[in-house]
From Swiss-Prot:
Name the UniProt record assigns to this protein: Undecaprenyl-phosphate alpha-N-acetylglucosaminyl 1-phosphate transferase
Purpose of the protein: Catalyzes the transfer of the GlcNAc-1-phosphate moiety from UDP-GlcNAc onto the carrier lipid undecaprenyl phosphate (C55-P), yielding GlcNAc-pyrophosphoryl-undecaprenyl (GlcNAc-PP-C55).
GO molecular function, one term: UDP-N-acetylglucosamine-undecaprenyl-phosphate N-acetylglucosaminephosphotransferase activity
One of the protein's GO biological processes: enterobacterial common antigen biosynthetic process
A Pfam family it matches: Glycos_transf_4
Transmembrane segments: 3-23, 46-66, 69-89, 132-152, 158-178, 187-207, 213-233, 242-262, 294-314, 318-338
């Protein structure tokens, strides 16, 4: 396998997914698989919810054209296919949370039983001894599957954000695996990025606002499930290339946002799944940034946190328990900002006004 072959495959995946996306959006409008504007959604017109379906089609295409071994490929496609199908039904008919959670749990059980993919160890996060989970690992795995799916679902609030954050996660995992010699899994991660990029282009309106699409619950479910699947493949076992604590850094922003928001809702006596406008992108936009600027800032923050995890993985001199402590400190800082969102927004607005005044007051230099 050489870089030319890999590049050709990735370009083929990108082109296939792009063509499929244009086809799928036409079908979606005919069958009513569209997002309608309401008091919480500010877009105009009916937007096809086909981003996730196109990404899944791109991965099916990937597994069909590549000639290298991807572990549990058929099992993954079957499990992911069920989740995408249920997600599409939810996008169309609004299925209850209990039904979706039950199906996600069932898929998680199939993954553990037939793929032997489960959390058996959390690594050395408490010092010099390994935290082996035993039978409790099966229950924690189900929670991890649910958490990953919901974490990526909850960040899908502004254009481009879900795509950007998922690309950061897959890029971080792919880089670690590539340099560790786990080529097939690395290519899978890069193929996910190639399949997501066409969605980002249409979602951001780069090819024109008339072609806009949304990811839908089918897409966020697929992305979250794929992330946790690959992490289980790579963080468990005797010769795992990624430490379990590194996984926290790789999905830091979606994970922090989900935990902070759910905690805030529960404290208010609300359902953890009830919608509100307290997510990180809402905070940044209240500070005066546009939706596009918020997307860029959050994606860069996610890339920074993921880079910390990747560098620590390669350095080998930072203990896993130290990385856990640092992650918890980062999470506490995030929670502080969310809890005092109005203060943070006011501070950012004040800084922006000062910067504008400084730019406006600087003398013009002429030759």
């Amino acid at each position: 396998m050489n870089l030319l072959t890999v590049s050709t495959d990735l370009i083929s995946i990108f082109l296939f997914t792009t063509l499929f996306l244009f086809f799928a959006r036409k079908v979606a409008k005919k069958v009513g698989l569209v997002d309608k504007p309401n008091f919480r959604k500010r877009h105009q017109g009916l937007i096809p919810l086909v981003g996730g379906i196109s990404v899944y089609a791109g991965i099916c295409f990937t597994f069909g054209i590549v000639d290298y071994y991807i572990p549990h490929a058929s099992l993954y496609l079957a499990c992911a296919g069920v989740l995408v199908f249920i997600g599409a039904l939810d996008d169309r008919f609004d299925i209850s949370v209990k039904i979706r959670a039950t199906i996600q749990a069932a898929v998680g059980i199939v993954m553990m039983v037939f793929g032997n993919l489960y959390l058996s160890s959390l690594g050395y996060i408490f010092g010099s001894w390994e935290m082996v989970l035993g039978p409790f690992g099966y229950f924690l795995t189900l929670f991890a599957v649910w958490a990953a799916i919901n974490a990526f679902n909850m960040v899908d609030g502004i254009d481009g954000l879900l795509g950007g954050l998922s690309c950061v996660s897959f890029a971080a995992i792919g880089m670690i695996l590539w340099f560790d010699g786990q080529t097939s899994l690395a290519i899978w991660c890069f193929a996910m990025i190639a399949a997501i990029l066409p969605y980002i282009m249409l979602n951001l309106g780069i090819l024109g606002r008339r072609y806009k699409v949304f990811m839908g619950d089918a897409g966020s479910t697929l992305i979250g499930f794929t992330v946790i699947w690959i992490l289980l493949e790579t963080t468990q076992g005797k010769t795992h290339p990624i430490s379990p604590v590194t996984a926290l850094w790789i999905i830091a922003i979606p994970l922090m946002d989900m935990v902070a928001i759910m905690y805030r809702r529960l404290r208010k006596g609300m359902s953890p799944f009830s919608p509100d406008r307290q997510h990180i992108h809402h905070l940044i936009m209240r500070a005066g940034f546009t939706s596009r600027q918020a997307f860029v800032l959050i994606t860069l923050a996610a890339a920074l946190l993921a880079s910390i995890g990747v560098l620590a993985e390669y350095s080998h001199f930072v203990p896993e328990w130290v990385m856990l402590v640092l992650f918890l400190l980062a999470f506490l800082l995030y929670g502080y900002c969310i809890k005092r969102a109005w203060k943070v927004a006011r501070f950012i607005k004040r800084v922006k006004r000062r910067l504008r005044r400084n730019r406006g007051g600087s003398p013009n230099l002429t030759k």
